[in-house]
Design a protein with these regions (language model features):
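Conserved C-terminal region and hinge/linker of Rieske [2Fe-2S] proteins, especially
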Residues: 1-200
Length: 200
């Protein structure tokens, strides 16, 4: 279903990269133009990461079969999901593991009885990912500190805290600050995790 759109996107990006290099587009840009270009290119990267994260989530789901021979990893000759991702993405093990953790946080659950799609662990984080607001760094910055409070803190409280931090990622926080970077998101999430789990 995605094969043709992704192929078209690859061709377009390839043309842009080659053209930008030949035209020395970055060198010729003013500082304000260059800043806008960096921000726009980073947003494109987050959209690409969103597609990759969802794909990794599905690879993980297909590799969770208790029967080893029926796992996607086994079908493709790999020991586990990390090894398969290293092969497919050319990433190192640490980056492959980060992709898996991000996918776990935003992957919608599937009902075992009806096959219906259910909410992800952090719905607002998933929505921010789909909107190109956060990529792998942002997802993990928000979700990792909050996930560490489970099971001592109710899921609803973790989600509410994530919603507040996501507002900061979108630049919609109460202080009117611009969209927060991943490091600031991590600090916000850690603060909420400490507040929710004071005995943890």
């Amino acid at each position: 279903l995605l094969a043709q759109p992704v192929s078209d996107l690859q061709s377009q990006i390839s043309e842009i990269v080659r053209g930008a290099g030949e035209d020395r587009a970055c060198e010729r840009a003013t500082e304000s133009e260059l800043a806008r270009q960096v921000a726009a290119i980073a947003e494109i990267g987050r959209f690409a990461e969103a597609l990759l994260i969802d794909a990794v989530g599905e690879v993980t789901r297909r590799s969770e079969n208790p029967v080893r021979d029926e796992r996607m990893t086994s079908h493709l000759g790999c020991h586990d999901v990390t090894e398969l991702l290293q092969t497919l993405t050319r990433l190192d093990p640490r980056s492959a593991a980060r992709l898996q953790r991000a996918a776990k946080a935003v992957r919608p659950a599937v009902s075992a009885t009806s096959g219906e799609m259910l909410d992800a662990d952090f719905p607002s984080v998933r929505a921010a990912m789909v909107d190109g607001v956060v990529g792998v760094d942002g997802i993990l910055a928000i979700t990792a500190p909050l996930q560490q409070t489970a099971p001592r803190v109710f899921e609803s409280a973790r989600r509410d805290a994530a919603d507040i931090v996501v507002a900061e990622a979108r630049g919609e926080g109460p202080d009117g600050a611009p969209p927060a970077c991943a490091e600031l998101l991590r600090i916000h999430a850690q603060t909420w995790a400490l507040a929710l789990d004071q005995d943890g």
